[in-house]
């Protein structure tokens, strides 16, 4: 049986009545509270990158991490593998420190000044950034490596996340009590994408599933050609996802159903795969392949606008589109910025350390976190 542990002094979150993803509410230009920027995991922001970025400062956390950085009110947070949550302010000074005292391999989510994070020991923890205290822990029977997401419905703000115990959980954000759950049949490793009152996720069993968060019941599913290593990305009523054999799929969604689907890009190489989350704009799809190419793909006809060969091994870091530029990191440690129209190289920086997480973007700054726990802040000269 799942158990919920509450802590004295717990504060309640503000609850708003809505029927849509919760990440649009109150997000300021100094916030990047989810690793893809929004609950749909679109990987798009209209916040422009610095025109001529330079390294403003770096902070060495000195403990390995696989997290992406998240930002709340200008302070950047992450958790290392030993369970130490760190917060560094916009000037590069330590501003927050909290120990979970357990192993962590997940990227946190921040919402309403609460940091939510999964743990290897099977718990999802809610930590108050103002109180520096754990509000509640929700226990599952498997490790939680997926980044949580949030959705609003019926006046309740809920947190949705997957576990290695094969369940997708929806819990009340204010107290951690379980609302519902769905058994997928396979462990859940990636973040779910939120579309209206539904969540969409793929798994190692090659199924892409749509779940209604009100009921915890599936509304539709689609079997892909190979297993799905990364989260889907959503723009409007269109969902895009890549599989491990190198295909990219487009799905049109309506009332919780897949009304149409097609391969917008077919694999041409048996060694090709897509292991990072796609990025979407109104006209274009950006995909990072295991062959080290970043692709720009026309959403209307599936034609490749351009492709750019990156330096070194690409890893799991996902690209982000920032207005008219796209930023991407490689596992080798190279940060690259390209023009979205022609794929022209605009800027490049070698961190000298491996990167597996995605950047975080705020006004006039962006942040990159290496696997050694070094946080780098870039901005204008």
List where the protein language model places each region.
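Loop/turn-rich, solvent-exposed surfaces of beta-rich toroidal or solenoidal domains
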Residues: 288-295, 307-337
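Blade-level signature of beta-propeller repeat domains, shared across WD40, Kelch, NHL, RCC1
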Residues: 351-381
């Amino acid at each position: 049986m799942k158990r919920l542990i509450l802590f004295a002094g717990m504060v309640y979150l503000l609850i708003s009545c809505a029927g849509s993803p919760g990440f649009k509410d109150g997000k300021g230009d100094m916030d990047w509270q989810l690793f893809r920027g929004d609950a749909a995991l679109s990987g798009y922001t209209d916040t422009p990158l610095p025109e001529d970025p330079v390294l403003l400062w770096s902070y060495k956390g000195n403990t390995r991490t696989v997290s992406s950085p998240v930002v709340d009110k200008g302070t950047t947070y992450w958790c290392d593998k030993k369970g130490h949550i760190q917060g560094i302010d916009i000037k590069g000074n330590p501003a927050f420190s909290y120990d979970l005292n357990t192993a962590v391999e997940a990227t946190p989510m921040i919402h309403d000044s609460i940091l939510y994070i999964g743990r290897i020991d099977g718990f999802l923890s809610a930590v108050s950034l103002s109180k520096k205290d754990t509000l509640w822990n929700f226990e599952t029977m498997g490790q939680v490596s997926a980044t949580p997401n949030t959705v609003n419905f019926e006046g309740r703000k809920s947190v949705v996340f997957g576990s290695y115990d094969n369940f997708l959980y929806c819990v009340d954000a204010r107290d951690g009590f379980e609302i519902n759950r769905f058994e997928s049949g396979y462990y859940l490793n990636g973040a779910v994408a939120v579309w209206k009152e539904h969540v969409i996720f793929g798994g190692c069993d090659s199924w892409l599933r749509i779940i209604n968060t009100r009921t915890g019941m599936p509304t539709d599913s689609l079997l892909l050609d190979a297993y799905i290593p990364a989260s889907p990305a959503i723009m409007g009523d269109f969902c895009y996802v890549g599989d491990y054999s190198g295909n990219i799929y487009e799905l049109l969604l309506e009332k919780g159903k897949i009304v149409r689907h097609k391969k917008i890009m077919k694999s041409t190489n048996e060694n090709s795969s897509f292991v990072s989350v796609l990025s979407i704009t109104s006209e274009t799809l950006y995909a990072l392949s295991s062959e080290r190419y970043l692709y720009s793909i026309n959403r209307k006809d599936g034609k490749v606008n351009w492709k750019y060969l990156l330096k070194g091994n690409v890893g799991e870091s996902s690209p982000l589109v920032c207005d008219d530029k796209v930023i991407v990191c490689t596992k080798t440690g190279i940060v690259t910025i390209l023009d979205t129209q022609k794929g022209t190289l605009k800027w490049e920086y070698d961190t000298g350390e491996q990167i597996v997480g995605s950047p975080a973007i705020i006004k006039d700054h962006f942040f990159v976190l290496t696997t050694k726990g070094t946080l780098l802040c870039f901005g204008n000269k």
